[in-house]
């Protein structure tokens, strides 16, 4: 199995992220998908697979995930034309709930601070 250097792997992941960030809004024009933002790309060591982590604003994550999965093959073929490398990784889309989780944690912290301030003022 051929493995690539971590530096090359990261450069390729960054390039795939830039290209997909340009291709997805153009190729998945449905307004019902909301705003899809690519958070990160994780490549397998042999570059055969790419986990594409995304968030979505203004739409249900499940709906966006389904649309991305349905277009994965087409997006793969478009990447092949752009990247000029022998093997383009197979795309696997994953919803990244960490942003949502962070917002919820921030809300809970704000709520706890407000509650403490109210208790101190009594």
Swiss-Prot record:
Molecular functions (GO terms): ribosomal small subunit binding
Say if the entry is tagged with keyword Cytoplasm: yes
Q: Which GO terms describe its biological process?
A: maturation of SSU-rRNA
- Gene3D superfamilies registered for this protein in UniProt: 3.30.300.20
NCBIfam families listed in its UniProt record: rbfA
Q: How does it assemble?
A: Monomer. Binds 30S ribosomal subunits, but not 50S ribosomal subunits or 70S ribosomes.
Q: Which family does it belong to?
A: Belongs to the RbfA family.
Can you say what this protein is called? Ribosome-binding factor A
The gene it comes from is rbfA
